[in-house]
């Protein structure tokens, strides 16, 4: 394993461990409150977060055929995490018509995105990124009800996380041309995850 891949695997191994601990924390908080919506939504969110970092760690640690399989799983897990991150905001913060509408649309897009990702054709990277961006910023259609339901500091945390993820895409797109760009992408992903997790912990839980 060359240095870049070592960094990629270790950085997301740290993310996986943190995600598992974070999952336990938010689910315990939800259980103590006895809120089934929080228990379900936090479980979905935390599980998708843990899956993404675990799969990414394995992808960057393996070689040969196994690496190719986990590369595909790595891409699929991105759709799951985006939809999983929306889940607490839609089922707990918004709920109602806006919450359920956004919940249905975002998970529908996740299914469509994963279906496209599973196709054997190559060269779908740009299309995948466009779907990531569409899913990530779809929340803006519910901006007004979200601002009414979420404290402003929570909205800033949500926005900041989105900016980290989106800003990192530049490094993701050119990671095959420039060495270590993929590692920088990983740092942006970690920053986005931390921002969104803290927002959920402090303003949704």
Language-model-detected regions and their locations in the chain:
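Multi-pass alpha-helical transmembrane bundles in non-GPCR membrane proteins
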Residues: 1-205
